[in-house]
Amino acid sequence: MALVQQSSPHARRARPTSRVMLWVILAALPGLLAQTLFFGWGNLINVVWCIALALGSEAAFLKLRGKPVAFFLRDNTAAVTGLLLGLSLPQFTPWWVSGIAVVSAIVVAKQLYGGLGSNPFNPAMVGYALALISFPVAMTTNWAEAATLWGGAPGFGETLAKIFTGGQTAVDGWTMATPLDEYKHKIASHTSVEVLGHPTFGDLIARGWEWVNLAFLAGGVLLIALRIITWHIPVAFLAGIAAMSLAFGSNADQYAPLQLHLLAGGTMLGAFFIATDPVSAATSHQGKLIYGAGIGVLVYLIRSWGNYPDAVAFSVLLMNFAVPFIDHYTPPRTYGHHKARRGVPGRSGG
């Protein structure tokens, strides 16, 4: 039997960015499907609108910079930014609020820094945070009540009219606070058992939201299995939330239980799809663990003591600030080299 001789290194060709981003889009579809099934058409409409506007904004700015538009649009990164914003925004967000968020993400947070690979901050979270700070009412009062498509959720036409016309419609009766918001504002005057007994929390812990988070968890596991992302950031993210929740868990009548933190809000979307952005995240495995854990801790702190019930965007952006510091002290090992041994050179113990 003839042996094939091949010189080292036996390196595999890197996956093109367009294929990686396509897998991210496909892995997020179960979460989008769950959002649509349990909260109506709002997120699906937001996703289509945000992706279209993200591609248009990127194309326009690339044209202004004299760059080949078709070449850069094919990397699918603008589509992923639009997708993440559409998944993160409230279901009935006015079109102009989501539009400002998308344009800010693409133009300000990405293209002004030089485009793909040059942005120090997660573009989607920059757009989300800007919209939340600038339009707090629109970003906090347009969440849909959990109602399945077959169980009375607003129709496609009603949802479309609410988003793009802003008029008073029957949809207004379907808006409500999220489970995290409900818990945060009622725990001061009620016991934990009383708060969790509200219909907002459903049979498990967060009516509708638990299935959305589990769907994003399934998509995230797929990305890890395909080696699109590594496990370090998501696991450290969730471990950070769990550690903080367990540390304060003895006071159950003041702080939300662990399962609410894990299965409500944008926890799984943030852990597997947002925090793992390869450009703005830490580089080495050790750095990714620190980065992910920092985000998880910040999410818990802001949810518990901050002004915003969900805190993924601000936590990711704050840790983006820390990435240069983390990378400086946790550089990846150079291929073929070992860590230097401590001690005086030429001296051996004995």
From Swiss-Prot:
Q: At the top level of its lineage, which domain of life is listed?
A: Bacteria
The cellular component terms of Gene Ontology attached to this UniProt record, alphabetical and capped at eight, are:
plasma membrane
Per its UniProt record, the required cofactor names are:
FMN
E.C. number = 7.-.-.-
TM spans (from-to): 20-40, 42-62, 89-109, 120-140, 204-224, 228-248, 255-275, 282-302, 306-326
Q: What is its main location?
A: membrane
Question: Where can this protein be found?
Answer: Cell inner membrane
One of the GO biological process terms = transmembrane transport
Q: Which sequence ranges form a coiled-coil region, renumbered to this chain?
A: none
What kind of membrane protein is this, topologically?
Answer: Multi-pass membrane protein
Residue numbers bearing the FMN phosphoryl threonine modification = T178
Sorted keywords for this record are:
Cell inner membrane, Cell membrane, Electron transport, Flavoprotein, FMN, Membrane, Phosphoprotein, Translocase, Transmembrane, Transmembrane helix, Transport
Q: Which Pfam families does this chain map to?
A: NQR2_RnfD_RnfE (PF03116)
Q: How does it assemble?
A: The complex is composed of six subunits: RnfA, RnfB, RnfC, RnfD, RnfE and RnfG.
Main function: Part of a membrane-bound complex that couples electron transfer with translocation of ions across the membrane.
Which HAMAP family did the record assign? RsxD_RnfD
- Family that this chain belongs to: Belongs to the NqrB/RnfD family.
Q: What is this protein called?
A: Ion-translocating oxidoreductase complex subunit D
